[in-house]
Design a protein with these regions (language model features):
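Membrane-integrated ABC transporters
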Residues: 1-35, 47-59, 63, 76-84, ...
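Short active-site loops of ABC-family nucleotide-binding domains
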Residues: 85, 105, 113, 117, ...
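ABC-type nucleotide-binding domain
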Residues: 328-588
Length: 588
């Protein structure tokens, strides 16, 4: 029940407001008891006793009590509603802050739609609990107990007979609670799955349309939607079958009153006014019984939701800030791998990797798909931790560096470019929000993006869609590169950043990068040798191993993997030029 304690820790901030609200609920419940008494007095004293002068006063009291109750109800509803909004705001902020601290492994294991449902649907169930269920449950319990006490004060025998219903009510309540929770657990799971599927399909709509798979995705959505509908219907059928039981129990009280009350009035044990009074209190007993099923239903929704939110909140990241942080605001940029082994589950990704890079050097990384290039870069940024060996930046183990310091000194243009739904300027300035427009433009020029940006309708103020919709692959890569450059980092990482750019544009970008790379360490992951031919050292990875290392000339001399790739790529290029030249002579 740790999730309940966690929930109460948020509720504590609003305890004064909640206590005031509960006190007002208590006063309102007391006022509810007055009108049945007045109804009985009207029957006994006004109608039967013929004291007609009392009728006006009694009616004014009833009206006054009703007005005061309405005012108090409005006040305590505002107390609970404001508390619920504040609590959910705090909880959502804390949950989102927790999400921002999670590592890559967490997001690899959890789908975006699942996490979104925690922040929306589950949070709304918590809000409903605080704004409605708490006061409603408290009010119903108070009204039930007070009405029972008042019936005892009117006629003990009648009250004892009505108590016969309580054990049956308790049994039905416990039975409903036992059966409804698994049903609501399934509802929340199905909702998360549906939400995740919809989010994934919408995000990948271009692929869906490119492969004409709309009908296929619609069928999959129908299955998810059917599952959610069936889960909802199953939960509804469980709690709805208990509603008639509570109705029957409440009607039993009415039957007891009619039978016993009638005999007591005939025998002179009760007056008609007493019976009218008891009938008024009977409504107060019946109403909580009728509402019990709904309250349990809402309570189980809340418990299911808060448990799922709590699971996300209590998930500890694998990558944590070190206990004894080495503080160093500006890094020089040297990088060292010492016998690094890295694996995920049972799959070895990197095996015994060792190399050293001096500050200001440019390092090219090449290898077949799946050889471990991106994983190697991820270890420098400490997106993951090594299983054996060490990764050092400025001769400090990255596990001892402050994460913000480490990543703040690294500018990375990722292979999978992500751009926010913002202006182009906002996207480029993401890593350095305090920069000037001139700095943004300078970074764009280095990335060879300034020209196409200025040609856009609003220039740098052009709003680009989510994930850069509306831009070509090469344009997105250049904006991503400009974003990494503008951060002014000690280490720049380009993860296949120019794969969607033509060779002429790539050459222009490389020339611009050379002007700033003397004071920065640059890692370039590439499949095209032209992207790394100028590097101070080139790392060749094959199946997770560092099989070759050296300059372009040194690696060609080894006649190994690098040499093979080079001659293959440039051989194809030479053949292409030869065919084109022959075609040109033929046309002449």
């Amino acid at each position: 029940m740790g999730y309940i304690r966690w929930f109460l820790s948020f509720l504590k901030k609003y305890r004064v407001r909640m206590i005031v609200g509960l006190i007002l609920v208590f006063i309102t419940a007391l006022l509810v008891l007055i009108n049945p008494q007045i109804s009985g007095m009207i029957v006994d004293e006004v109608i039967e006793g013929q004291h007609y002068e009392k009728l006006g006063i009694l009616l004014l009291i009833m009206i006054g009590v009703t007005l005061v109750r309405s005012l108090l109800r409005f006040t305590f509803l505002m107390c609970f509603e404001s508390s619920s909004q504040g609590l959910v705001y705090d909880m959502r902020e804390e949950a989102y802050r927790k999400l921002m601290k999670e590592d890559f492994n967490f997001f690899n294991k959890n789908r975006t739609g699942d996490l979104m449902s925690r922040q929306t649907g589950d949070m709304d169930a918590v809000r409903h609990m605080v704004s409605h269920v708490i006061y409603f449950s408290f009010e119903n319990i108070l009204v039930f107990l007070m009405a029972l006490v008042m019936i005892f004060s009117v006629n003990v025998k009648m009250a004892l007979c009505m108590l016969i219903v309580l054990p049956f009510t308790l049994a039905v309540t416990l039975s409903q609670r036992r059966h409804i929770k698994p049903a609501f657990d399934r509802v929340r799971d199905c909702f998360s799955s549906l939400n995740a599927f919809a989010q994934e399909t919408i995000a990948g709509n271009r692929v869906v349309k490119a492969f004409a798979k709309e009908d296929y995705e619609l069928e999959k959505f129908d299955r998810e939607n059917d599952g959610y509908r069936d889960a909802q219907l199953n939960a509804a059928s469980i709690w709805m079958k208990y509603i008639p039981m509570f109705e029957i129990l409440s009607q039993c009280l009415t039957i007891i009153l009619m039978i016993m009350g009638g005999f007591m009035v005939i025998d002179g044990e009760m007056t008609i006014g007493n019976m009218v009074t008891v009938n008024g209190y009977l409504w107060m007993l019946n109403s909580p019984l009728r509402q019990a099923g709904w309250i349990i239903n809402d309570l189980q929704r809340f418990l299911t939701a808060i448990e799922k939110i709590y699971k996300v909140y209590t998930t500890e990241p694998d990558i944590k800030q070190p206990e004894h942080v080495v503080e160093k605001r500006k890094l020089k940029g040297s990088v060292t791998f010492e016998h690094v082994n890295y694996y995920t589950n049972d799959d070895t990704v990197l095996k015994d990797i060792s190399f050293h890079v001096e500050p200001g050097q440019t390092v090219g990384i090449i290898g077949a798909t799946g050889s471990g290039k991106s994983s190697l870069i991820n270890l420098i940024c400490r997106f993951y931790d090594v299983n054996q060996g060490r990764v050092l930046v400025d001769d400090i183990d990255v596990r001892n560096l402050n994460l913000q310091t480490l990543r703040g000194n690294i500018g990375i243009a990722m292979q999978d470019v992500f751009l926010f739904s913002d202006t182009i300027e906002g996207n480029i300035a993401y890593g350095n929000p305090d920069c000037t427009f001139e700095q943004v433009q300078a970074a764009a020029k280095i990335a060879n993006a300034d020209e196409f940006i200025r040609e856009m309708p609003e220039g740098y103020d052009t709003i680009i869609g989510e994930r850069g919709v509306g831009l070509s692959g090469g344009q997105k890569q250049r904006i991503s590169l400009a974003r990494a450059i503008l951060k002014d980092p000690s280490i720049i990482i380009l993860d296949d950043t120019t794969s969607a750019i033509d060779m002429e544009t790539e050459s222009m970008i490389q020339n611009e990068l050379k002007k700033i790379s003397d004071e920065r360490t640059v890692f370039i992951i590439a499949h095209r040798i032209s992207s790394i031919i100028h590097a101070d050292q080139i790392l060749v990875l094959d199946n997770g191993r560092l099989v070759e290392r050296g300059t372009h000339e040194q690696l060609l001399a080894k006649k190994g993997y690098y040499s093979t790739v080079f001659h293959h790529q440039y051989g194809e290029f030479d053949r292409f030029k030869k065919v084109r030249a022959e075609k040109g002579r033929g046309e002449a």
